[in-house]
Design a protein with these regions (language model features):
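Active-site beta->alpha loop and helix N-cap motifs at the rims of alpha/beta catalytic domains
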Residues: 2-102
Length: 102
């Protein structure tokens, strides 16, 4: 596991389009806003990110998108585990790491 930087980590919400799809253009704007304003990291994909309204695939795609747009500028932290089964939670968290979470 990587060492996470100390500092400011806002909780990132998940913006949705009018037809209830993840709004990737708005996510890109949030990443740019956080980077431009000196955040050290983003707490992406957590309870405040509406993870219970996202499928595992959507969470992984979102984490991957955030990581690409971030391009290493800030640390990325995610919980993103919604399963009731511990083994499944481990798999969900591994997928978050595989898609850019630290």
């Amino acid at each position: 596991m990587k060492q996470i930087r100390n500092g400011i980590y806002p909780t990132m919400i998940t913006p949705f389009t009018d037809d209830n799809h993840v709004d990737y253009a708005a996510i890109e704007q949030l990443v740019e806003y956080y980077a431009a304003n000196g955040c050290d990291g983003i707490f992406a994909l957590c309870l405040s990110s509406e993870i219970f309204h996202l499928s595992d695939k959507e969470m992984q795609q979102m984490m991957n998108f955030i990581a690409k747009k971030n391009n290493g500028r800030m640390s990325l932290v995610a919980s993103g585990h919604t399963s009731l089964n511990v083994d499944a939670q481990i798999e969900q968290l591994k997928a978050m790491c595989d898609n850019g979470a630290e």
